[in-house]
Amino acid sequence: MHAVTESMAGRAAVLHLLPLSTVESPKVTLLRGGYPEILAHPRDSNLWFQSYLQTYLERDVRHISQIRSLAAFRRFLTLIASRTGQILNKTDLAAPLGVSVPTITEWIGILETTGQIVLVPPYFENFGKRLIKSPKVYLTDSGLGCHLLGIDTARALSRSPFSQALFEGFVASEIVKQQVNLGRRRELYFFRDQRGLEVDFIVPHGAQELVLIEATASQTVYPNAARSVLSLARSIRNHRTRCVVVHHHRCWTKTMPYLPQALER
């Protein structure tokens, strides 16, 4: 786009190509992610991700910004993977890398521009607060996240302390992919109040309805898994609500195909 010398506003459409979703391919899993090359050759995943990261850093990142140290940016990406599902705290990210907060702000912008992360802001009735409060950060592709965190088998994933956060990111990415593929505006939020009530995701559906989503990496789901979404639903007065619990079954994405159906109704 840097080579375009005249404005294309109103004359061109920009398409955002993300990794494949579970709707587009049943081979997409939490461990593999959704890059087509990985789905076609799963045994070569580590080698492919290594090559992908090298190409991404040396071509995409360097093309966007004159970063002095690509090695530092690579460590930053790994640090983001370890903080997936957490509130974005730029100061905490800057300290271990020995860089400034403005540098972290720039690097976050690069990751967002290149589609590597999904930023999920908090939900407030006041729209202005959504723009001010810090978002949660997730990697767009769970397979890349697993690679960065050294998770290369389903057994390692099930035992990893990052499994819940990675699964939340997987769900967030599926929602965003669906919205993008349907040509809709990206609208995805999380909820947390001062009393400690927290709901993983809120998706506006039209002007009058909110879909409340809880994502759990547990293989077995009990009724209390819906406690948070039901509690929030009871407190919402000016919107209709629907509650969805997405769980991590033996097959990593067994329940995921039902999520898009829930959002489309």
Question: Where in the sequence are the language-model features?
Answer:
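Active-site ExK catalytic segment of metal-dependent nucleases
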Residues: V211-T220
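Domain-level recognition of nuclease-like catalytic cores that cleave nucleotide substrates
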Residues: H248-R265
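Accessory nucleic acid-recognition modules appended to NTPase machines
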Residues: R43, L47-L210
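Active-site-adjacent loop/helix micro-motif of nuclease/hydrolase catalytic cores
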Residues: Q219-V229
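Switch/connector loops and helix/strand junctions flanking conserved nucleotide-binding motifs
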Residues: M1-A3, V23-E24, H147, Y222-N224, ...
